[in-house]
A protein has these predicted regions:
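N-terminal cap/leader regions of alpha/beta-hydrolase-fold enzymes
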Residues: 1-95
Length: 98
């Protein structure tokens, strides 16, 4: 099970990220960055991070929408998809913001 941490972007902006670490004394196999979908760092993305951690990888999923709306965690209904698309448009994903 992972935990929420705080990251600082190059411009000083602070954003949340979900971090999952491997259990046990063994050295991690590596590190991974999991990029959220339009639904934010929701339960699915956290489960993906936890799964990679179970396989030995330190995994971080930054909350990329935090600049526009904090703690985005939405589901998969048609209304959720519309909201996610709106957030993506506001965030202008594709430009370097994080």
């Amino acid at each position: 099970m992972g935990q929420w941490i705080e990251l600082t972007a190059s411009d000083g902006f602070r954003l949340a990220a979900y971090r999952a670490d491997p259990a046990g004394p063994d050295k991690p196999r590596g590190g991974l960055v999991v990029v959220q979908e339009i639904f934010g760092v929701n339960s699915h993305i956290r489960a993906v991070c936890d799964g990679f951690a179970a396989d030995g990888y330190v995994t971080i999923a930054p909350a990329l929408f935090d600049r526009y709306e904090r703690s985005v965690d939405i589901g998969y209904t048609p209304d959720d998809i519309a909201r996610g698309r709106e957030l993506k448009a506001r965030a202008k994903i594709g430009r370097a913001h994080v």
